[in-house]
Amino acid sequence: KDEFDKGNYVYTRNFVEALRTLDMVPRQFVYISSLSIFGPIHEDNYAPISERDTAMPNTAYGVSKLKSEHYLQSLNDFPTVIFRPTGVYGPRERDYFLMVKSIKQHIDFAPGFKRQDLTFIYVRDLVQAVFLAIEHGVRQRAYFVSDGNVYFSRTFSDLIQKELGNPWVIHIKCPLFILKVVSLLAEFSARCLGKVSTLNADKYKIMKQRNWQCDISPLVEELGYRPEYPLDKGVKEIIAWYKKEGWL
């Protein structure tokens, strides 16, 4: 929790305060927040999360990102544009790479049995959104970012399997209560060893969330955002990159 607060809020605040103190306020300050600041909402009707909704983060990561947003939005004289991307994937990304490695070994784990709607954003499309905001001189605005599609929980793993050329994969749906116990034990063990566990209480809450839809229409209508990487195209690129760089 402290590390998230330090990395996402304290360092952001210190950097911005230094810019203001030195009279080096930029024309625009782009802050990459997260869809996670809204927490698990609309899980009954699976409606897209929009700017009309109230942010209610349930993770230390989400809380730290929201804290940074509130700080930046309180500075009326500081030109900020905020992006709230959904799951970002691309070359060098390691969290999703763990899933790729697992599927290469013919195992795919999915959290829970209830419907889960997922959204993704390839890093190049996120960069496109950032440059559009810079070109349009956007200030004091926040946008959700995804590739505009909604995917079933199996779609990502099926695409990875296809690009890896795996003839078969065992798909295992893990009950949430088991996943929670494993996450807590992994976090405790890592803490005892002075390490950071990829699987932890925060990660469990993220995997547990069922609705990751978000409304990108303001980004499309105001800035002309046109995502170029649907999931199949993005997965093809990252698998090719992992192979080229010797990760696989």
Question: What are the functions of these language-model segments?
Answer:
Residues 4:
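A hydrophobic alpha-helix adjacent to the NAD(P)-binding/active-site core of NAD(P)-dependent oxidoreductases
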Residues 13-60, 81:
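Conserved Rossmann-fold NAD(P)-dependent oxidoreductase catalytic core, especially the SDR/UDP-sugar
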Residues 63, 67, 93-98, 112-134, ...:
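Substrate-positioning beta->alpha
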Residues 123, 158, 182-226:
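Conserved C-terminal active-site "lid" loop/helix of NAD(P)H-dependent oxidoreductases
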